[in-house]
A protein has these predicted regions:
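Histidine/acidic-residue-rich, glycine-tolerant segments that coordinate divalent metal ions
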Residues: 1-48, 100, 202
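Short secondary-structure capping/turn micro-motifs that flank functional sites
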Residues: 15-17, 38-39, 71-73, 163, ...
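Residue-level "edge-of-site" marker
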Residues: 13, 35, 69, 160, ...
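C-terminal regulatory/interaction regions
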Residues: 174, 180-193, 197-208
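His/Asp/Glu-enriched, well-ordered alpha-helical/loop segment
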Residues: 47-65, 69, 76, 81-93, ...
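Active-site-proximal flexible loops/turns
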Residues: 39, 75, 101, 192, ...
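Anionic group-transfer/hydrolysis microenvironments
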Residues: 34, 96, 192
Length: 208
């Protein structure tokens, strides 16, 4: 933590107690909340809380969600927003190379020996369509999803895409908001949250 390294809990079947121990050891973030991680399980007749429950009960844990409207449906997006809030929830694309590309075949991972996937219905799927194989969402889509599907205020959705992740990563001294002395990173979008201009450190790098 002194070196601003962010240890994160992800893709695990850990129990609540194990997450609690990890948190005391310095783990303060959870990657892709709900994706490939434990919730309430039953072991030898007893129920055990998992990573998901720990995310809500341990106050200093921050989370990120793949808010494409597919990995997490509307009720779960609303649940995370209601109980973790915009200051402890970051939006994450988790996008693979199929993002922004037409539907069809793609490869997850290495181009030489990676996993073949199918891009359709706004998400990457395994060839047999038995599971998701990654996201193809862009950041503007995440904001649109939170506003138009989950019904949260635009200002909170933007915060979850900008200042909150910057704070989690300890780079909010230069990123995450428009303030004197910070990098001039600006997105201009229309009423439907479609990107019109992208400005990076004061330079226009995209114009529609």
């Amino acid at each position: 933590q002194r070196q601003h390294i962010l240890p994160s809990i992800a893709h695990t079947d850990a129990t609540y107690e194990e997450v609690e121990k990890a948190n005391k050891a310095g783990y303060t973030h959870i990657t892709h909340l709900y994706s490939a991680m434990s919730s309430v399980t039953r072991r030898n007749a007893f129920r055990h809380a998992g990573v998901v429950e720990a995310a809500y009960l341990i106050d200093d844990i921050t989370v990120e969600i793949i808010a494409d409207g597919i990995h997490l449906p509307k009720p779960l997006l609303q649940f995370v927003y209601k109980f973790k809030g915009p200051d402890k929830t970051a939006l994450c694309t988790d996008a693979m190379r199929g993002a922004g590309m037409p539907d069809g075949e793609s490869i997850l991972g290495s181009l030489t020996n990676g996993q073949k996937v199918i891009i359709e219905d706004g998400v990457a799927k395994m060839p047999d369509r038995s599971a998701f194989a990654g996201s193809v969402a862009t950041t503007d889509r995440l904001v649109r999803t939170m506003v138009q599907l989950a019904g949260i205020p635009l200002t909170d959705a933007i915060r979850m895409m900008t200042l909150t992740p910057a704070r989690i990563l300890h780079i909010d001294s230069s990123k995450g908001s428009l303030e004197a002395g910070k990098d001039a990173d600006i997105i201009i979008f229309d009423n439907q949250i479609n990107v019109i201009n992208t400005i990076s450190e004061g330079h226009v790098i995209y114009s529609k």
